[in-house]
């Protein structure tokens, strides 16, 4: 990733801005809608090796003086799915893209939850996103 960041540096105009928007390296939470919010029921088990490597790469190009960190904010992101099928499809895609371990245990638990069988609640996956702004230096 350091190579990609250096290539970004090369093509950015002087004083250009790099936007780094990624999910935070925290386990996603799964629950159900409840009133205006949601109720947490389970926590996923992701591996964050790639996330930590990306953080190190960003720190590396900042420490080397290619970019200056100008801002950082963290905000909530909610993915709402109306059916168990929607959740299973999202989870399968999520696991395949990230090469994460199977979460069949989670699908079984969500499928057995009364909130799914009554059809009155949506399934919610929450995870924060981190937005960083980096300014090209030199």
Model-derived features: positions:
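Long, contiguous hydrophobic alpha-helical segments, chiefly transmembrane helices and signal peptides
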Residues: 8, 20-22, 81
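Conserved short hydrophobic patches within well-ordered secondary structure
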Residues: 13, 21, 32, 49-58, ...
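Low-complexity, flexible helical/coil segments
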Residues: 24-31, 52-61, 105-112
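Conserved Class I S-adenosyl-L-methionine
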Residues: 63-138
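A short glycine-rich, Lys/Arg-flanked "PGG" loop and its adjoining helix->strand segment in the class I
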Residues: 2-17
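Conserved class I S-adenosyl-L-methionine
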Residues: 17-49
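Active-site capping/gating segments
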Residues: 43-72
């Amino acid at each position: 990733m350091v190579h990609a960041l250096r290539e970004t540096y090369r093509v950015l105009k002087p004083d250009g801005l790099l936007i780094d928007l990624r999910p935070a390296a925290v386990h996603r939470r799964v629950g159900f809608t409840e009133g205006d919010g949601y109720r947490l029921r389970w926590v996923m088990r992701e591996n964050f090796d790639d996330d930590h490597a990306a953080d190190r790469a960003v720190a590396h190009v900042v420490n080397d003086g290619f970019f200056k960190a100008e801002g950082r904010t963290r905000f909530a992101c909610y993915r709402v799915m109306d059916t168990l099928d929607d959740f299973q499809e999202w989870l399968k895609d999520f696991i395949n893209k990230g090469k994460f371990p199977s979460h069949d245990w989670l699908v079984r638990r969500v499928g057995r939850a009364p909130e799914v069988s009554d059809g009155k609640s949506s399934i919610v996956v929450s995870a924060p996103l981190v937005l960083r702004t980096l300014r090209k230096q030199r």
